[in-house]
């Protein structure tokens, strides 16, 4: 066992050769590297699979022995400062490692087909492998300095993948938004790290926790300063895990490819913030005010994310706000001190959300054959519906993921979310009411997404179904670059037909006008496509199921969604695998903790939570099931008959909720009005002050010196007669003034 732990340092570095070799290959042998591009995908999956097997071996040993292993190398040593690098293998590390590798492998396999059309295929796999390396390095770090280094690398990889299609302005802006928002949190994290080093004199977790606890017990610290440093550390987690109010980057991050959305939302970037709080829990738990703040931010995010998801029309944005809300549940659990419940929900949510995102990617992939490669169309649930008979495997997998997130037993998220909901009653009745109510909202909006996507009729064929014409549609090239409008005459092959007149004169979603692609782009993608002849025009009237390469990871994630929840079911102490796994960490936080459970109380709470979820599902079916719904704008309430004043009142409520969700709770508008505009005004004032005041004073002095010098120069001409004239003139003026003053 000791030998296995000694080689654990290699875990973060195993996926690293792939991006390095891809970079060298593209630099030195570009043609050969591109021709063998499938080989790089295989190597990425193979190396990450080795890490997964290694992580599973470590986890099994930890479950059996409840051990924690740390090894460090001294990097800098002197009398005043020492810096060590190493790795820490504990239950939190092993859980995160398995989560990262299993989800990462599924996403890599899925991406091989999903990204096959993209000329950035190799770049994508290089980024993904480096992303895995960064996240694995983060979870194995033994001190705050390593945490910060890999924290920044995780952020960098996220920015690269969010802006993967950087030629699209909206993707570039989303990347910038994620970068700027996370800079706020990262700066706070850095200040917090420096603050706690100033207090304790150590970056190592074990030494830091021990020294800090001794200082707290002896009352040798300034609690105000300690709380400030803890808040700064927590700010990093707020930004990275998209917690209120630094959540604004998360929905815009959907501009990246769908596979990376699955990885970010399941096991990497947003999970990093939860991991950081869990890692620093022994530090936070002795500071009551910071624990209250963590739970407060968590419950606000829970409710806020759920309300923003109510009326989203973009399938990926709806899932993004769902992630935000579920991360709020995890943060709430950590703030309440429910360490086990938070990590349990992190595990179950990761597999369920990965399943949902890969399922949405399959839907988007099938819709692109109808509406073109345009995210605003292929991700728009307004144009979906009726996909059940066209993509049955995707539909069933998405349904399972939806029911899991709704909290329906025996699926994964039911067990973990139910623990958090039960613990919330013990912490705060107000928080409990909000958390339980949001569980109903979660069931509502997730069922809404499912119904709009798969039930009813394929709305892409009924463009004027609601009585309103859609805005003009535009083409997006395969690489995400904005294409030309329909009127562009320089296009040269048919991609999809739109707005075609039927025989009865009614407009449908198809037309005789065509989209075409530039010749150079066609030449780039031809070798990578499975279509034998790209010149042959083939228009699909209906979506079709994805290839087996994309379906295989979805089917594996279905198994995880069905069975991973049984890891944490507390039947008894011997069967509760998760509690045995987390024994060292739980004992560190709660000495002599008792994991026994009252099954009668558990079943009573479970019936209540399932009833709330079922009520949310029923409301969604009532409003969005095709037999009732008129699909008028696909808003929240769209099926009530006219009822006079009551209908007017319900319309006001509907419009208010829709505006709240569509405008993202007005947080983005608030930031744009006050922060962005304020920074610009401050910049203009600073520019004016710098140019007119700071530069104006020395420039004015220089100008006056020049003017005086010119006057003196004109006076001093070198003629004695001039000197005598000025001399007698000044004497005369002086005598004249003196005479009049003495009168």
Swiss-Prot record:
Compartmental location: Plastid, Chloroplast thylakoid membrane
Membrane protein topology class: Multi-pass membrane protein
EC numbers, comma separated: 7.1.1.-
Membrane-crossing segments per the record: 9-29, 40-60, 89-109, 125-145, 147-167, 185-205, 219-239, 258-278, 284-304, 327-347, 354-374, 396-416, 425-445, 551-571, 607-627, 723-743
Annotated Pfam families: Proton_antipo_C, Proton_antipo_M, Proton_antipo_N
Reactions catalysed according to its record: a plastoquinone + NADH + (n+1) H(+)(in) = a plastoquinol + NAD(+) + n H(+)(out); a plastoquinone + NADPH + (n+1) H(+)(in) = a plastoquinol + NADP(+) + n H(+)(out)
UniProt keyword Transport, yes or no: yes
Chief place where the protein resides: plastid
InterPro entries tied to this protein: NADH_UbQ_OxRdtase_chlpt_su5_C, NADHpl_OxRdtase_5_subgr, ND/Mrp_TM, NU5C-like, Proton_antipo_N
GO terms under cellular component: chloroplast thylakoid membrane
Gene Ontology biological process terms from the UniProt entry: ATP synthesis coupled electron transport; electron transport coupled proton transport
Signal peptide limits: none
Subunit structure: NDH is composed of at least 16 different subunits, 5 of which are encoded in the nucleus.
Purpose: NDH shuttles electrons from NAD(P)H:plastoquinone, via FMN and iron-sulfur (Fe-S) centers, to quinones in the photosynthetic chain and possibly in a chloroplast respiratory chain. The immediate electron acceptor for the enzyme in this species is believed to be plastoquinone. Couples the redox reaction to proton translocation, and thus conserves the redox energy in a proton gradient.
PANTHER family: NADH-UBIQUINONE OXIDOREDUCTASE CHAIN 5
Protein name per the record: NAD(P)H-quinone oxidoreductase subunit 5, chloroplastic
């Amino acid at each position: 066992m000791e030998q296995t732990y000694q080689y654990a340092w290699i875990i973060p570095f195993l996926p690293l050769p792939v991006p390095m070799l891809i970079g060298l290959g593209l630099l030195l042998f570009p043609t050969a590297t591109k021709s063998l591009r499938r080989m790089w995908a295989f190597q990425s999956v193979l190396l990450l699979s080795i890490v997964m097997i290694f992580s599973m071996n470590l986890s099994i040993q930890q479950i059996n022995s409840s051990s924690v292993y740390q090894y460090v190398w001294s990097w800098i040593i002197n009398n005043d400062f020492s810096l060590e690098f190493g790795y820490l293998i504990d239950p939190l590390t092993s859980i995160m490692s398995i989560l990262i590798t299993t989800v990462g492998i599924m996403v890599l396999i899925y991406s091989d087909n999903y990204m096959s059309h993209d000329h950035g295929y190799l770049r994508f796999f290089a980024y993904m492998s480096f992303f895995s390396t960064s996240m694995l390095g983060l979870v194995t770090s033994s001190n705050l300095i390593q945490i910060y280094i890999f924290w920044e690398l995780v952020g960098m990889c996220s920015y690269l993948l969010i802006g993967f299609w950087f030629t699209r302005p909206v993707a570039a802006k989303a990347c910038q938004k994620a970068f700027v928002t996370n800079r706020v949190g990262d700066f706070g994290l850095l200040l917090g790290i420096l603050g706690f080093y100033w207090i304790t004199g150590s970056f190592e977790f074990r030494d830091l926790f021990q020294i800090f606890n001794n200082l707290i017990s002896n009352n040798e610290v300034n609690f105000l300063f300690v709380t400030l440093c803890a808040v700064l550390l927590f700010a990093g987690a707020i930004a990275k895990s998209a917690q209120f109010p630094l959540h604004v980057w998360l929905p815009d991050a959907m501009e990246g490819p769908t596979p990376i959305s699955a990885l970010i939302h399941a096991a990497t970037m947003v999970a990093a913030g939860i991991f950081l709080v869990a890692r620093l829990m022994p530090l936070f738990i002795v500071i009551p005010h910071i624990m209250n703040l963590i739970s407060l931010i968590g419950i606000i995010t829970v409710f806020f994310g759920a309300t923003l998801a109510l009326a989203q029309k973009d399938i990926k944005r709806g899932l993004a706000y769902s992630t935000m809300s579920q991360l709020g549940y995890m943060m709430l659990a950590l703030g309440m001190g429910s360490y086990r419940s938070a990590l349990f929900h992190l595990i179950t949510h990761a597999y369920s959300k990965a399943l949902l995102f890969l399922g949405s990617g399959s839907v988007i992939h099938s819709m692109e054959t109808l509406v073109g490669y345009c995210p605003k169309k292929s991700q728009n649930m307004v144009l979906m519906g009726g996909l059940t008979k066209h993509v049955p495997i995707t539909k069933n997998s998405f349904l399972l993921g939806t029911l899991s997130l709704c909290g329906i037993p025996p699926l994964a998220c039911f067990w973990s979310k139910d623990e958090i909901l039960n613990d919330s009653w013990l912490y705060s009745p107000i928080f409990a009411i909000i958390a339980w109510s949001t569980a109903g909202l979660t069931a509502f909006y997730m069922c809404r997404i499912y119904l709009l996507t798969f039930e009813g009729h394929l709305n892409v064929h009924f463009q004027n179904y609601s009585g309103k014409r859609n805005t003009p549609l535009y083409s997006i090239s395969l690489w995400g670059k904005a294409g030309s409008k329909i009127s562009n005459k320089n296009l040269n092959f048919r991609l999809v037909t739109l707005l075609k007149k039927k025989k009865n004169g009614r407009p449908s979603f198809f037309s005789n006008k065509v989209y075409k692609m530039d010749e150079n782009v066609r030449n780039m993608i031809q070798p990578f496509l499975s279509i034998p002849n790209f010149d042959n025009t083939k228009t699909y009237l209906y979506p079709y199921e994805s290839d087996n390469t994309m379906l295989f990871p979805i089917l594996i994630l279905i198994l995880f969604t069905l069975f991973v929840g049984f890891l944490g079911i507390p039947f008894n102490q011997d069967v509760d695998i998760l509690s045995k796994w987390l024994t060292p960490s739980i004992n560190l936080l709660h000495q002599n903790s008792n994991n026994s459970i009252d099954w009668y109380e558990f079943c009573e709470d479970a019936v209540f939570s399932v009833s709330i979820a079922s009520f949310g599902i029923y409301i969604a079916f009532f409003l969005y099931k095709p037999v009732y719904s008129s699909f008028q704008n696909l808003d929240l309430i769209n099926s009530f008959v006219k009822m006079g004043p009551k209908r007017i009142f319900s319309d006001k409520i509907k419009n208010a909720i829709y505006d709240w969700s569509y405008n993202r709770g007005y947080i983005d508008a608030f930031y744009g009005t006050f922060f962005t505009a304020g920074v610009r005004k401050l910049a203009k004032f600073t520019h004016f002050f710098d140019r007119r005041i700071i530069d104006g004073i020395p420039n004015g002095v220089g100008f006056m010196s020049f003017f005086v010098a010119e006057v003196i120069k004109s006076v001093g001409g070198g003629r004695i007669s001039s000197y005598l004239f000025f001399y007698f003139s000044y004497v005369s003026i002086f005598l004249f003034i003196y005479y009049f003053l003495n009168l």
